[in-house]
Each structure stands twice: as structure tokens, then as C-alpha cells.
């Protein structure tokens, strides 16, 4: 697979304007990235501009804290799919996970998977807030719930992707599930290290620099 197809070209800053999003979309078309990842309010715009290409539209749910109710996340997912999203990056309920409420976490992911109507679901586990044991548990629950990917980070918390976390996540989910490294990846070398450790998708706001 060519390097550009690993990349979710990402712009999730709250101050991003329509002009910024359109620039992101044009870059994704030019460099043939896997997707653009945008906030839900921009999904329709992205869909309209990408529907005749093979660049997917990715959006976020329960972002960036993961602390909204399951019902809210399900509704967000349904609206995003209706608006044209191909991929959903949902944030896990970190506090519920850390409280040992495994069933809550698993059921929530399962409901998002169901609401996504067979679109790709990536579960952001926010590795920087978890112990090793919790990272393993988050990955296991995500897999059991039927998600397609586990993802390291929102990029809005205390840290981003680390190679050792990617390795652990890959070892936990096995070879048949996707692993997305996201947050703090700024160079091609950093991206290649993530891929070597098991990442099958890279979330980055500097996608153009990564493939130049």
C-alpha cells in the first residue's frame, strides 16, 4: 500500500473555517489520502466535494472527551452517516473504563457500531490517560464490540501516539483489526516507525509534509 493511503488528513481545530476545510479536501484529493477527518458540522461539505473520489469522509463522535452519554454518541453517529460520513472515530468513555465498568464501555461501542450501518468504526482509547492494563482492556472491549480499529489519541489530551503503545495495541487485537496512530506525528520517520510497530492508519494534520 502506498504511504498516502495510510493517512487520515485531519483538521479538528474548533476555529477551522470553511476555507480551511476546502483546502484540506483539495490536498486530500491531490495526494490521494485515505480520508479527510473533520468535525461533524463539516461532514456534508466534505461529502459533496469528495463523493466522486476514493477519498473517504471521516468524522468524530463524543469528541474530544468521550464523556457524553451513549445516546448522544449514537445520535451523533446516525447524523454523521446521514450527512455522508464513511468512517466514525468515536471516543471511548475513559472514566467508565477506569472505573472498571467494562460492560458500559463495551455496550456503548457496540451501539455505535450498530448505528454506523457497516461504516468503519475506530475507537479512540486515549492512551495517555490509561495504564498498560487499561490499554489492553480498552482494545479487547473494542474488538469484542465489533469495532474495526483502535486508535491511540484525540490529539486534544495530554499526549499523542507512541510506538510502544502501537505495538501493545497490535499485540492485543491481533492481525485482523486496524490500529490507528494519531497525535504528535510530524515527520515521515515518525510515521514509518508507527507503521513498523503495527499501525495501519495514521491520523495527522500535516499529511502533505509526511508524503512530500
Swiss-Prot record:
Quote the protein name from its UniProt record. Deoxyribose-phosphate aldolase
Its EC number(s): 4.1.2.4
* Keyword Lyase among UniProt keywords: yes
Which Pfam families would you find in this protein's record?
A: DeoC
Q: What class of enzyme is it?
A: lyase
What GO molecular function annotation could you give as one example from this UniProt entry? deoxyribose-phosphate aldolase activity
Question: What are the disulfide bonds?
Answer: none
Q: Which PANTHER family is this protein grouped with?
A: DEOXYRIBOSE-PHOSPHATE ALDOLASE
Principal location listed in the UniProt entry: cytoplasm
Q: What does UniProt list as this organism's lineage?
A: Bacteria, Bacillati, Bacillota, Clostridia, Eubacteriales
Example of a GO cellular component annotation carried by this entry: cytoplasm
Q: Keyword annotations for this protein?
A: Cytoplasm, Lyase, Schiff base
In the record, the note on similarity to other proteins reads: Belongs to the DeoC/FbaB aldolase family. DeoC type 1 subfamily.
Q: What parts of the sequence cross the membrane?
A: none
Q: Outline what the protein does.
A: Catalyzes a reversible aldol reaction between acetaldehyde and D-glyceraldehyde 3-phosphate to generate 2-deoxy-D-ribose 5-phosphate.
The reaction(s) annotated as catalysed by this protein in its Swiss-Prot or TrEMBL entry are: 2-deoxy-D-ribose 5-phosphate = D-glyceraldehyde 3-phosphate + acetaldehyde
Its pathway is: Carbohydrate degradation; 2-deoxy-D-ribose 1-phosphate degradation; D-glyceraldehyde 3-phosphate and acetaldehyde from 2-deoxy-alpha-D-ribose 1-phosphate: step 2/2
HAMAP family associated with the record: DeoC_type1
Q: Biological process GO terms, please? A: 2-deoxyribose 1-phosphate catabolic process; carbohydrate catabolic process; deoxyribonucleotide catabolic process
**UniProt subcellular location:** Cytoplasm
Give the matching InterPro entries.
Aldolase_TIM (IPR013785), DeoC (IPR011343), DeoC/FbaB/LacD_aldolase (IPR002915), DeoC_typeI (IPR028581)
Where does the secretion signal sit in this chain?
Answer: none
Amino acid at each position: 500500500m502506498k504511504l498516502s493511503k495510510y493517512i487520515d488528513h485531519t483538521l479538528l481545530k474548533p476555529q477551522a473555517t470553511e476555507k480551511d476545510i476546502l483546502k484540506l479536501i483539495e490536498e486530500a484529493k491531490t495526494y490521494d489520502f485515505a480520508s479527510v477527518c473533520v468535525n461533524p458540522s463539516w461532514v456534508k461539505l466534505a461529502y459533496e466535494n469528495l463523493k466522486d473520489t476514493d477519498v473517504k469522509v471521516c468524522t468524530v463522535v463524543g469528541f474530544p472527551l468521550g464523556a457524553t452519554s451513549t445516546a448522544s454518541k449514537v445520535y451523533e453517529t446516525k447524523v454523521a452517516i446521514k450527512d455522508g460520513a464513511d468512517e466514525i472515530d468515536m471516543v471511548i468513555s475513559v472514566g467508565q473504563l477506569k472505573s472498571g465498568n467494562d460492560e458500559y464501555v463495551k455496550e456503548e461501542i457496540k451501539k455505535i457500531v450498530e448505528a454506523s450501518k457497516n461504516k468503519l468504526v475506530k475507537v479512540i482509547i486515549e492512551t495517555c490517560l490509561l495504564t498498560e492494563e487499561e490499554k489492553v482492556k480498552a482494545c479487547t472491549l473494542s474488538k469484542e464490540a465489533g469495532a474495526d480499529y483502535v486508535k491511540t489519541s484525540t490529539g486534544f489530551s495530554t499526549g499523542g501516539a507512541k510506538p510502544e503503545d502501537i505495538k501493545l495495541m497490535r499485540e492485543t487485537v491481533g492481525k485482523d483489526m486496524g490500529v490507528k496512530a494519531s497525535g504528535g506525528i510530524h515527520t515521515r520517520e515518525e510515521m514509518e516507525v508507527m507503521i513498523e510497530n503495527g499501525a495501519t492508519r495514521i491520523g495527522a494534520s500535516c499529511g502533505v509534509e509526511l508524503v512530500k
